[in-house]
Regions:
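NAD(P)+-binding Rossmann beta1-loop-alpha1 motif at the extreme N-terminus of oxidoreductases
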Residues: 1-50, 104
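Phosphate-coordination loops involved in phosphoryl transfer and adenosine-cofactor binding
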Residues: 4-7, 62, 80, 108
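Structural motif
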Residues: 11, 19, 68, 86, ...
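Short amphipathic alpha-helical segments
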Residues: 21-23, 45, 95-98, 123-125, ...
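Conserved N-terminal Rossmann-fold NAD(P) cofactor-binding segment
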Residues: 30-81, 90-92, 96, 127
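ADP-ribose/adenylate-binding Rossmann-like module
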Residues: 82-123
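Rossmann-fold dinucleotide-binding core
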Residues: 110-157
């Protein structure tokens, strides 16, 4: 299967989510950077130009990151080819986020988690089979721009 990734939705604007969105911007890929409030999403984007070491090749790359919140911008999920979840390492919170986004997920979208400790089978337990087929773990290491390492874990589907 070959699919071009033209837009990504990064769920979670904390340390990892914001830097992953920034690194996607370094590759010229626009993203929606989601968090529970618009303020947190904006703050995540702002950190891209202030963190050391710098997550962006050029500060202008931050223009490719669009801060979003789940209440006002959830429909943007439907524009994303890849939805990358990078929220806190709690299964109950991840499940809540998945339940919000699944109705907006386009049929060809890939859904992944940046988890480093929750088993894939636990993450997908309540997902429909067609989504399980498109789900995997994509664990970036911190800081993503400098740690050229990505752990990939696929499921049985």
């Amino acid at each position: 299967m070959s699919q071009k990734i033209e837009k990504v939705a990064v769920l979670g604007a904390g340390v990892m989510g914001a830097q992953i969105a920034g690194h996607l911007a370094n590759a010229g890929i626009p993203s929606f950077l989601f968090d529970i409030s618009q303020e947190l999403a904006e703050k995540g984007k702002e950190t891209l130009t202030s963190l050391k070491p710098a997550p962006l090749y050029k500060p202008k790359n931050a223009d490719l990151v669009t801060p979003c919140n789940y209440d006002d911008h959830i429909a943007n999920i439907g524009e994303a080819d890849w939805i990358l979840e990078a929220v806190v390492e709690r299964l109950d919170i991840k499940d809540l986020i998945y339940s919000k986004l699944l109705p907006h997920l386009k049929d060809s979208a890939i859904l992944t988690s940046n988890t480093s400790g929750i088993p894939l089978t636990d993450l997908t337990a309540s997902m429909p089979d067609d989504v399980k087929k498109r789900f995997m773990i994509t664990h970036f290491f911190n800081p993503p721009r400098y740690m050229q390492l990505l752990e990939l874990v696929r499921g049985e589907h």
